[in-house]
């Protein structure tokens, strides 16, 4: 199949610049890049592929993926993006309401993943045999709410869904999106420990949106091609616990202390920026779905044997915090290696110290939610 024939016949879809055309399976884009005789096409394909961490293998075991909370603001676009991932052979979409419509809609996309929708009585079947489970379920942020305000509702949702994962697919890799991630990941870990099926390599909090934002803001400020930019983001996934390491960003750019501080704070407050811009009508659903799809793609490539390094929030000994986001190597069993933080600037050292009280308190809150139940 040619690249041209794979794109919907649409007079508004022209190569190489129309963004509609970018929505192709990553491994297909890489293949097109390799075979194209057009240098412009090759450049376009390479830029599209670099939205993901690294070039995906063109083949690999088809994986069963479940999205829990598939009818929500994040779940719907995430379900579409996972349907487009060529590493997915079976896609289970679960929610307490609205799933049949989402599943029917997504199933019409002409990619190989077979889609099934499940309602509140179908969770066990949705999870059975899954390799990867993504959890965006829960209530979204509203104006004036912090991630911690979501705890009372989302903590119970995550605990109950993770219990089902422990019962029906205990070996699956877990990607937890539901906020507050600083607490919901410890909740997931403690619940799986309680059930005797915890594997620290397979429970990950999705902090990729912080990385995506840091890359975007850094590239914009310094006039760089965002596709060539890398910025590690460590710590947690809320406010001051989000610490972009701009001293380790590539390509290198010289920034004043004022600019550095502004970029850091914008990365930390990115979620609030979107909530306020939507004026009470939503949160960062689209960018979160995009970031979650990037991270899920990396997890799938890791499961299929490709060496992948991503930032994610996991059980860790890198700092005094028992859970911490940093660069990790993903492999066939989940997290294979947790990287050290590397050299930090004085500004970053101060940020690391400042985040600890809040991060530790959020972790303990999650732990006690399960232990005290």
Swiss-Prot record:
Family: Belongs to the LDH/MDH superfamily. MDH type 1 family.
Locations listed in the record: Mitochondrion matrix
Official protein name in the record: Malate dehydrogenase, mitochondrial
Top-level taxon in the UniProt lineage: Eukaryota
Pfam hit, one: Ldh_1_N
Catalytic activity line of the entry: (S)-malate + NAD(+) = oxaloacetate + NADH + H(+)
SUPFAM superfamilies: LDH C-terminal domain-like (SSF56327), NAD(P)-binding Rossmann-fold domains (SSF51735)
GO biological process assignments: malate metabolic process; tricarboxylic acid cycle
Chain residues that bind substrate: 141, 147, 179, 213
NCBIfam families: MDH_euk_gproteo
Residues reported to bind NAD(+): 69-75, 95, 154, 177-179, 288
């Amino acid at each position: 199949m040619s690249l041209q024939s794979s794109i919907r016949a649409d007079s508004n879809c022209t190569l190489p610049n129309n963004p509609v055309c970018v929505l192709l399976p990553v491994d297909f884009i890489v293949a097109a890049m390799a075979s194209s005789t057009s240098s412009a096409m090759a450049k376009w394909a390479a830029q599209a592929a670099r939205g993901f961490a690294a070039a995906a293998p063109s083949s690999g075991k088809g994986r069963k993926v479940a999205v829990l909370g598939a009818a929500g603001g994040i779940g719907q676009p995430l379900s579409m993006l996972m349907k487009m991932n060529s590493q997915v052979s079976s896609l289970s979409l679960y929610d307490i309401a609205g799933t049949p419509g989402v599943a029917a809609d997504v199933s019409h996309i002409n990619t190989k993943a077979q889609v099934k929708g499940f309602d509140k009585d179908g969770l066990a079947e949705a999870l059975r045999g899954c390799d990867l489970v993504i959890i965006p379920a829960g209530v979204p942020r509203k104006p004036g709410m912090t991630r911690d305000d979501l705890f009372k509702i989302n903590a119970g949702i995550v605990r109950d869904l993770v219990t089902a994962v422990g019962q029906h697919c205990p070996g699956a890799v877990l990607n937890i999106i539901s906020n507050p991630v600083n607490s919901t990941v410890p909740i997931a870990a403690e619940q799986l420990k309680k059930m005797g099926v915890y594997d620290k390599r397979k429970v990950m909090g999705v902090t990729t949106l912080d990385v995506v934002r840091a890359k975007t803001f850094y590239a914009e400020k310094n006039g760089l091609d965002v596709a060539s930019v890398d910025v590690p983001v460590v710590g947690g996934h809320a406010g001051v616990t989000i610490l972009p390491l701009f001293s380790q960003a590539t390509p290198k750019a010289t920034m004043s202390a004022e600019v550095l501080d502004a970029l850091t704070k914008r990365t930390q407050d990115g979620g609030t920026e979107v909530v306020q811009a939507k004026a009470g009508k939503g949160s960062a659903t689209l960018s979160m779905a995009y970031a979650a799809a990037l991270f899920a793609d990396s997890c799938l490539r890791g499961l299929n044997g490709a060496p992948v390094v991503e930032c994610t929030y996991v059980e860790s000994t890198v700092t005094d915090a028992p859970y911490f986001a940093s660069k990790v190597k993903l492999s066939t069993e989940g997290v294979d290696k947790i990287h050290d933080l590397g050299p930090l600037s004085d500004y970053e050292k101060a940020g690391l110290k400042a985040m600890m009280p809040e991060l530790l308190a959020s972790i303990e809150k999650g732990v006690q939610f399960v232990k005290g139940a």
